[in-house]
């Protein structure tokens, strides 16, 4: 499966989520399950997505002591997810332990990526938590730490992609939320870009939610975005 699109499932009810999922083609996208849905619906929901042949990005952004995060990552691998993430701000040792625990899974291990700076955060937000740096400076710092830990890549806003691609190389995966097709609402994302521009900048995977999930014809919107990014 070669699609670069990850559809973010942000629903309150399982039936609503599955109604959307059953309208789209697993060969054209992967699916992201975040904290709200996973807390409400649990692993059985992920299993239902797997039964429909979708790859799943388990977006739980683990951030805890190293042993706890490593064991959580192992549980995600046992569940069979395609990708799982953690917060780079948890530190080098936390990331290294999470990566090491996946070694026995070999080629079946999920991609392990780190969250750098949330796309809703701006300079003032960082300053309020004691970080006297711009979002780009902090992203670059945490991306280098992630790479040092041996992880597969990072989540970053599309505006940071080109700099990170140059800084971290071609094999480092860049996963970008904040993707909005032309003419759609920016929602709660502050640093946004169109799908075509994000791919041109060097993104590997595009996380897109409401422009697809709230569309009158989700399958057609998904098809159109795939066509636009080639």
UniProtKB/Swiss-Prot annotation:
SUPFAM superfamilies: Ribulose-phoshate binding barrel (SSF51366)
GO process annotations (BP): 'de novo' pyrimidine nucleobase biosynthetic process; 'de novo' UMP biosynthetic process
Pathway: Pyrimidine metabolism; UMP biosynthesis via de novo pathway; UMP from orotate: step 2/2
Reactions the enzyme catalyzes: orotidine 5'-phosphate + H(+) = UMP + CO2
Annotated catalytic residues: 61 (proton donor)
CDD domains: OMP_decarboxylase_like
Enzyme Commission number(s): 4.1.1.23
Cited SMART domains: OMPdecase
Protein family: Belongs to the OMP decarboxylase family. Type 1 subfamily.
Descriptive protein name: Orotidine 5'-phosphate decarboxylase
Taxonomic placement: Bacteria, Pseudomonadati, Pseudomonadota, Gammaproteobacteria, Pasteurellales
């Amino acid at each position: 499966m070669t699609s670069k699109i990850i559809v973010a499932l942000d629903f309150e009810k399982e039936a609503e989520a599955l109604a959307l999922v059953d309208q789209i083609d697993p060969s054209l996208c992967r699916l992201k399950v975040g904290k709200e849905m996973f807390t409400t619906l649990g692993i059985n929901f992920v299993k239902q997505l797997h039964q429909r042949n979708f790859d799943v990005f388990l977006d739980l952004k683990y951030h805890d002591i190293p042993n706890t995060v490593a064991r959580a990552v192992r549980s995600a691998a046992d569940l069979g997810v395609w990708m799982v993430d953690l917060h780079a701000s948890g530190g080098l040792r936390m990331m290294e332990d999470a990566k090491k625990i996946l070694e026995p899974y070999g080629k079946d291990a999920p991609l392990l990526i780190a969250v750098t700076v949330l796309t809703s955060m701006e300079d003032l937000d960082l300053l309020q938590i004691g970080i006297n740096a711009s979002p780009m400076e902090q992203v670059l710092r945490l991306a280098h730490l992630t790479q040092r830990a041996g992880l597969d890549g990072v989540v970053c806003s599309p505006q940071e992609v080109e700099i990170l691609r140059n800084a971290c190389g071609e094999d480092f995966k860049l996963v970008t939320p904040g993707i909005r097709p032309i003419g759609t609402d920016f929602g709660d994302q502050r640093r946004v870009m169109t799908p075509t521009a994000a791919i041109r900048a060097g993104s590997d995977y595009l996380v897109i939610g409401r422009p697809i999930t709230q569309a009158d014809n989700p399958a057609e919107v998904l098809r159109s975005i795939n066509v636009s990014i080639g």
